[in-house]
């Protein structure tokens, strides 16, 4: 899977992150992160203890120096946590700045009701206004093409250098504000008010201005706050108990113990993980309307996938004409081409092209005044009505069969055989009829995208079921489904069938993802837990979905699901690591506190740390430096491998649980060896 590659951190991002780290020290801001707020409060208390070492009756050699060292380490701990968040935000802001360059003061050519053109600022445009955009002009806002055909450079938004053809109707009518017309002209009806375009939404999202905490983040934050309160209560109770038993514990040591035991590591990285998850999605050219949408991707159980464009290339091209009922093949080709002359779909154009290759010549002027009936999901057929009243139709087997039967026509005995022949080849059969007589079948050939079997197998390994939706008959659907490797399929699928399929899965407690681009997909996109709309699709589809793919690649839903899973795994892994850290820090600090008054506590000093003060400072230093050490993992995410939930849990428990115990044991011991000479020189204690 490809994404926009960028440096992990640039000089500009680093400089901005350092400045922001200091700005975030404001207690009002720190209160948003209760765990780190407790650390900051501890920092202010130790400042007081540095100035007045005996304020709580504490005694000891060079206590002021010891308190000062604890103060500095606590300050650095808070600063590192702010730095982690600032780096994540900085990467988003850098991307936003690049996008802002495309959002200049654009001039719009507003077309009046009388056809006159008035030049106004793009900010004055309203929904429903129609503007003229000519070669070299920047499209002033999101809209739908109502007239004209032109090439549009979307590289400012999508990163794709190749221009995209835009024309009225179909999948290529939608245009995005900030993109540039590089040939011809377009008339565009504005569909977004200023400040609410996709460019504006994208800038707000990557800047983090509109980022709200997700339900999982809130739940985890609640657990972290609860743990912090528990340890705070324990420490408050420990002080009088220790005093009663004759153990003198300096207040700064108690604060150090509290900071080391509360989950500061994950507390300092939690916001960065969430922001980084959104950042990874945007680097795949997907706009997520919220962090909740990205998280939902990680919990998806079922994926509803359109066959065309997602599983197959969607370029169904006419490959053959098959006659039935003894019909003349020349007439079948004539009628097929005739009812496709005004069909602007790729299928319709390919039928006309194949007819030309077979020597058919039709006077197109003769049919200019004839009305064309477009294909719809309800009728599942298209065609024309000649001046003499004759109706020439092409469409799905069951739709044409029903029409012919209603007109008292006869169904050729070899029709089923012809349809099944095409279906078994994985093609789509289009049946052609003139009034109540069926002439034959058009074989539309499509190709399954390579590599899907392996990708669906990966999804199956992590418990995600895939269902293919297609308007094809059951035989064709079964052939394509088997070739692609999906778990199930819905043949002859209508828009309402997709909604029913989604509701059925949701009623079983499953989360569902789906892709779509048409207005008829909008209800299903809104119903799905994860709805990924194509940027080339209709405005209705994009408004209904909670994610939009700027590249208009339906297969990207597979990558988005993996990003969501990676986000959840990263958060879970680092939480496990953070809590496991406490075990090692417990064995470092507890013996150090009590070993002087209770010599037998020395047995708990399994790391053989040199002195009580070196043990406390070593644990505190490790607690601070582990935060920036884990920033790359928080930003890039834990490496994701498709596997069963049980195996994934076991792997992460071994790597981040057991590793979360071993790493601090080793780290604290190394730090202790480094700082012991300094502790002895300062004669702390």
From Swiss-Prot:
**Which CDD domains does the UniProt entry name for this protein?**
P-type_ATPase_K (cd02078)
Kindly state one GO CC term assigned in the UniProt record.
plasma membrane
UniProt-listed Pfam families = E1-E2_ATPase (PF00122), Hydrolase (PF00702)
Active-site positions on this chain: 306 (4-aspartylphosphate intermediate)
Binding sites annotated in the UniProt record for Mg(2+) = 517, 521
- Locate the coiled-coil region(s) and give their ranges: none
User: What's the catalysed reaction?
Assistant: K(+)(out) + ATP + H2O = K(+)(in) + ADP + phosphate + H(+)
User: Which InterPro entries does its entry note?
Assistant: ATPase_P-typ_cyto_dom_N, ATPase_P-typ_P_site, ATPase_P-typ_TM_dom_sf, ATPase_P-typ_transduc_dom_A_sf, HAD-like_sf, HAD_sf, P-type_ATPase_bsu_IA, P_typ_ATPase
Listed Gene3D superfamilies: Calcium-transporting ATPase, cytoplasmic domain N (3.40.1110.10), Calcium-transporting ATPase, cytoplasmic transduction domain A (2.70.150.10), HAD superfamily/HAD-like (3.40.50.1000)
What's the main place this protein lives? membrane
**Residues annotated for ATP binding in this entry:** 343, 347, 375-382, 394
EC number(s) per entry:
7.2.2.6
Has the keyword Translocase been applied to this entry?
A: yes
TM annotation in the entry = 36-56, 68-88, 218-238, 255-275, 587-607, 615-635, 654-674
Question: What is the membrane topology listed in the Swiss-Prot or TrEMBL record?
Answer: Multi-pass membrane protein
Which cellular compartments is it found in? Cell membrane
Which family would the database say this protein is a member of? Belongs to the cation transport ATPase (P-type) (TC 3.A.3) family. Type IA subfamily.
NCBIfam families on file? ATPase_P-type, kdpB
Q: Which PANTHER family does the record associate with it?
A: POTASSIUM-TRANSPORTING ATPASE ATP-BINDING SUBUNIT
Its recorded name reads: Potassium-transporting ATPase ATP-binding subunit
The protein's organism comes out as: Clostridium acetobutylicum (strain ATCC 824 / DSM 792 / JCM 1419 / IAM 19013 / LMG 5710 / NBRC 13948 / NRRL B-527 / VKM B-1787 / 2291 / W)
């Amino acid at each position: 899977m490809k994404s926009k590659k960028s440096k992990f951190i640039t000089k500009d991002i680093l400089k901005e992150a350092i400045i922001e780290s200091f700005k975030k020290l404001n207690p009002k801001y720190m209160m948003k992160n209760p765990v780190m707020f407790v650390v900051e409060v501890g920092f202010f208390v130790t400042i007081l203890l540095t100035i007045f070492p005996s304020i709580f009756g504490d005694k000891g050699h060079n206590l002021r120096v010891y308190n000062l060292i604890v103060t500095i380490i606590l300050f650095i701990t808070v600063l590192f946590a702010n730095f982690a968040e600032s780096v994540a935000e900085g990467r988003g802001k850098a991307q936003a700045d690049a996008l802002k360059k495309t959002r200049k003061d654009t001039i719009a050519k507003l077309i009046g009701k009388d056809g006159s053109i008035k030049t106004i600022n793009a900010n004055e445009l309203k929904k429903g206004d129609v503007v003229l955009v000519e070669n070299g002009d920047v499209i002033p806002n999101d809209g739908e093409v109502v007239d004209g055909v032109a090439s549009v450079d979307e590289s400012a938004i999508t990163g794709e250098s190749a221009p995209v053809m835009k024309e009225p109707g179909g999948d290529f009518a939608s245009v995005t504000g900030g993109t540039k017309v590089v040939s011809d002209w377009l008339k565009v009806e504005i569909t977004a008010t200023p400040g609410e375009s996709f460019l504006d939404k994208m800038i707000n999202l990557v800047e983090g201005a509109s980022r709200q905490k997700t339900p999982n983040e809130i739940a985890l934050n609640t657990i972290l706050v609860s743990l912090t309160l528990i340890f705070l209560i324990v420490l408050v109770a420990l002080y009088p108990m220790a005093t009663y038993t004759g153990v003198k514990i300096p207040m700064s040591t108690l604060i150090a113990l509290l900071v080391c035991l509360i989950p500061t590591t994950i507390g300092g990285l939690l916001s960065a993980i969430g922001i980084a998850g959104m950042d990874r999605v945007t680097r795949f050219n997907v706009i997520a309307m919220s962090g909740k949408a990205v998280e939902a991707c990680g919990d998806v159980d079922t994926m509803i996938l359109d066959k065309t464009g997602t599983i197959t290339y969607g370029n169904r091209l006419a490959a053959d004409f098959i006659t039935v009922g003894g019909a003349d093949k020349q007439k079948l080709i004539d009628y097929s081409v005739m009812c496709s002359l005004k069909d602007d779909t790729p299928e319709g154009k390919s039928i006309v092209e194949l007819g030309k290759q077979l020597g058919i010549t039709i006077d197109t002027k003769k049919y200019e005044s004839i009305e064309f009936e477009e294909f719809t999901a309800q009728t599942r057929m298209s065609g024309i009505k000649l001046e003499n009243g004759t109706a020439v139709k092409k469409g799905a087997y069951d739709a044409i069969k029903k029409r012919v039967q209603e007109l008292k026509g006869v169904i050729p005995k070899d029709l089923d055989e012809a349809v099944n022949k095409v279906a078994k080849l994985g093609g789509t059969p289009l049946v052609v009829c003139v009034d109540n007589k069926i002439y034959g079948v058009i074989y539309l050939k499509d190709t399954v995208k390579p590599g899907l079997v392996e990708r669906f197998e990966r999804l199956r390994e992590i418990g995600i079921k895939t269902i293919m939706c297609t308007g094809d008959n059951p035989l064709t659907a079964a052939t394509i489904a088997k070739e692609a490797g999906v778990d199930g399929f819905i043949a002859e699928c209508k828009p309402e069938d997709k909604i029913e399929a989604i509701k059925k899965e949701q009623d079983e407690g499953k989360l569902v993802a789906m892709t779509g681009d048409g207005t008829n997909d909008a209800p299903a996109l809104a119903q799905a837990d994860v709805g990924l709309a194509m940027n080339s699709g209709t405005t209705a589809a994009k408004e209904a979905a909670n994610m939009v793919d700027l590249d208009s690649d339906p297969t990207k839903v597979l990558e988005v699901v993996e990003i969501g899973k990676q986000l959840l795994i990263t958060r879970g892994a680092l939480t496990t690591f953070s809590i496991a850290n406490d075990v090692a820090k417990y064995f470092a600090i507890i013996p150090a506190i009590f070993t002087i008054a209770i010599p037998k506590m020395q047995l708990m000093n399994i790391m053989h740390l040199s002195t009580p003060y070196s043990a406390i400072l070593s644990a505190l230093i490790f607690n601070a430096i582990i935060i920036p050490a884990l920033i790359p993992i928080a930003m890039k995410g834990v490496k994701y491998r498709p596997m069963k939930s049980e195996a994934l849990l076991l792997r992460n428990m071994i790597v981040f649980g057991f590793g979360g115990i071993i790493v601090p044991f080793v780290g604290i011991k190394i730090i202790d060896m480094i700082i012991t000479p300094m502790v002895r020189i300062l004669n702390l204690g």
